A protein has these predicted regions:
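Single-stranded RNA-binding regions, centering on S1/OB-family and related RNA-binding modules
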Residues: 3-181
Length: 181
């Protein structure tokens, strides 16, 4: 989703050179300040655009930088608990698989893949059922439900997202098309 937002950026003193407009720097500074982070509603900001300064900036005594309110458009990646998502397996390890959903990685624990017990072959990058021919590997497209969501606002790469495929209509997209789902 795209949202109109307002926030404040810090424009360091070295950006205020004679003959240069602050508008030239606002785009780059706003992108650096906001992109690749979670907002206050735990939505991941992918891209910002149309940065417009609002009013005059403020200078804090002893700092020397300008603190400027900026209005901008933000393209957000939103996730909710129990939402059904699609992604591709990016890594297989002894406890399950990591699934790439948008800009984030989520864990699909081996106990949440099939009702059957599974065997993990880390070397081959596969997870397969013991009693059936169902198999997942790196690059396999899956549909899963988010069962736990703990965004880390200080470092989005450390966010914890848990998935399950143990419900009807979930699992490998290949399995689902074979079953007519």
């Amino acid at each position: 989703c795209i949202r109109d937002r307002e926030d404040t950026i810090r424009i360091p003193a070295e950006y205020m050179k004679k003959g240069q407009s602050l508008d030239q720097h606002i785009d780059r500074l706003a992108m650096t300040a906001f992109e690749g982070r979670f907002d206050e509603q735990n939505r991941f900001i992918l891209v910002t655009s149309n940065h417009t300064p609002l009013g005059r900036g403020r200078i804090i005594h002893g700092d020397g930088a300008i603190y400027q309110r900026v209005r901008f458009d933000a393209l957000l990646f939103c996730m909710d608990d129990y939402e059904v998502v699609e992604g591709a397996i990016s890594e297989v390890n002894e406890f399950g698989a990591f699934v790439r959903i948008g800009p984030m990685e989520a864990l699909l624990h081996k106990s949440q893949i099939l009702d059957d017990q599974v065997e993990v072959n880390v070397g081959a990058g596969t997870i397969s059922g013991r009693n059936d021919d169902k198999r997942l590997g790196i690059g396999t497209a899956v549909r899963a439900r988010i069962v736990s969501l703990s965004p880390d606002t200080s470092d989005p790469r450390r966010s914890k997202i848990g998935l399950t495929c143990k419900q009807p209509g979930l699992g490998s997209l290949e399995w689902l098309s074979e079953a007519g789902e």
